[in-house]
Amino acid sequence: AAFAIKAREEILLGAKVNDVLVTGATGGVGSIAVMILNKMGYNVTAVSGKDSKADYLKSLGAKSVINRAEFDKDPKLIDKGLWDGVVDTVGGKILANAIVQTNSNGIVAVCGNASTNELNTNVIPFMLRGIKLWGMDSANCSIKRREFIWGEAAKLIDFNLLEKSIQTVSLEELIETYPKILKGEISGRVLVDLNK
């Protein structure tokens, strides 16, 4: 999440950005992105398949919440521009719809594939609106850059809120928890405590 947000900062270079969409917002990466973007002053719209988590997402800083069914459909060639930026953690049709709804010169930062690793889109939004699609590769980032980004992110994260979004399980409990993760029944992060 922090790497995606840093990329947005670097590429926009002071451009006016207000409305940012975060997909997979109840997940580990998405929830942190909502928190950080809100602290940076953006109007964050969260996308989630869990209507029951709207209050949770608003407590993290989302101004509004949209059900993922609005995005999980075949995209148009181009749609009304709604977002100055997007942080996508899911891929697939949700990402494709976010792309066609991105405003001129917006950036779409891709940092996950929770739904699928596929993306079927067209070139129209890129040609007509000049939007940018950036993949986040934190694995090959230098230690110096990681430390800088993590340090900046740490200033923006509410660790009390973050702690509430972490569920700790034992290795044995992970067997029961993992299918719930795959079904989208878990929000936030799951921490496996090997000493539990």
Enumerate the predicted regions with their spans.
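Short internal alpha-helix immediately C-terminal to a glycine-rich phosphate-binding loop
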Residues: A1-K39
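Short, flexible, glycine-rich and Lys/Arg-enriched loop motifs at helix boundaries
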Residues: I11-N18, A69-W83, N140-C141, L161
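Residues at the starts of beta-strands that form the adenosine-phosphate
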Residues: D19, Y42-V44, I107, K132
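Short, well-ordered alpha-helical microsegments
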Residues: G30, A54, L95-A96, E118-L119, ...
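Alpha-helical segments flanking ligand/cofactor-binding loops in enzyme cores
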Residues: V34-M35, D55, A96-I99, I124, ...
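Adenosine-nucleotide cofactor-binding segment
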Residues: N38-K93
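Glycine-rich phosphate-binding loop and adjacent beta-alpha segment
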Residues: K93-F159
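C-terminal hydrophobic helical "lid"/dimerization subdomain
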Residues: K144-K196
